Curated annotation (Swiss-Prot):
The gene is thiM. Pathway: Cofactor biosynthesis; thiamine diphosphate biosynthesis; 4-methyl-5-(2-phosphoethyl)-thiazole from 5-(2-hydroxyethyl)-4-methylthiazole: step 1/1. Its cofactor is Mg(2+). ATP binds at K117, S163. It comes from Thermoanaerobacter pseudethanolicus (strain ATCC 33223 / 39E). This is Hydroxyethylthiazole kinase. The lineage of its organism: Bacteria, Bacillati, Bacillota, Clostridia, Thermoanaerobacterales.
Length: 264
């Protein structure tokens, strides 16, 4: 892992352009601020190309997608590619409907993605291994999600990050298993979307997108652990507030001390 990456992030304050869903847009903006980056939420087809030209990273999240939004994502993504701005794709619910699956694949074919972040079923489906989605919750169809993630990473020359009890991050060659996190994180809707924003924030200051993604997952998981241990937490509502505070109060020293990562 890149030491002091959080310190660099907070010094540089990368601008993260989001084209994201209407369910979690406010939380994604605030978690981006809490980690030390700057959010901008711009969806209009007429302005996304101009907006991404000022950004350090671009998030494409299909959680509440429309055909017009997918068009805006592709336009922004192509502009980001020309400008060498990292693009992070969150294929929320890929496999749940044809629109979500086809839109995810269309974006992957037309835009050079830097990081794909999804749950096991989303990644398994995009890797061609099958899977089951109920709403946007998942059950992988792959016997070995690590291999499915590596296959997808190699197919698109991209970092693939699979969130779960143990998170898996791979660039097709390197692979990391992150064991930070807490079950309480699953009681708050949008934690996956917020994690994507944190991944983008780190990718905005580190060109090794594998290392940046590992650092983001570790930081996010540690904040969840620390929030869950707080005496202020009585349930999902107080957990969410405390989680934001723990993201804000993270330091490189805390990350180094509490990280749980294994590499292959």
């Amino acid at each position: 892992m890149k030491k002091e990456l959080l310190k660099i992030l907070r010094e540089k304050k990368p601008l993260v352009h989001h084209i994201t869903n209407i369910v979690t847009v406010n939380d994604c903006a605030n978690i981006t601020l809490a980690i030390g980056a700057l959010p901008v939420m711009a969806h209009a087809l007429e302005e996304v190309e101009e907006m991404v030209s000022a950004a350090d990273a671009l998030v494409l999240n299909i959680g509440t997608l429309t055909n017009e939004q997918v068009e805006a994502m592709i336009k922004a993504g192509k502009a980001a590619n020309r400008l060498k701005v990292p693009v992070i794709l969150d294929p929320v619910g890929a496999g749940a409907t044809k629109l979500r699956t086809q839109s995810s694949k269309k974006i992957l074919e037309e835009v050079k993605i830097s990081v794909i972040k999804g749950n096991s079923a989303e990644i398994s489906i995009l890797a061609g291994k099958g899977g089951k989605i109920r709403g946007v919750e998942s059950q992988s169809g792959a016997d070995d999600i690590s291999e499915a993630a590596k296959d997808l990473a190699n197919a698109y020359n991209v970092v693939v990050a699979v969130s779960g009890v143990t998170d898996i991050i791979t660039d097709g060659k390197r692979i990391a298993y992150v064991k930070n996190g807490h079950p309480m994180m699953g009681t708050v809707t949008g934690t996956g979307c917020m994690l994507t924003s944190v991944v983008a924030s780190f990718c905005g200051v580190c060109e090794d997108y594998f290392a940046a993604t590992v650092e983001a997952f570790v930081a996010f998981g540690i904040a969840g652990e620390r929030a869950a241990q707080s005496s202020n937490v009585k349930g999902p509502g107080s957990f969410k507030v405390t989680f934001f505070d723990e993201i804000y109060n993270l330091t490189p020293e805390i990350i180094e001390k509490d990280k749980k990562v294994e590499y292959e």
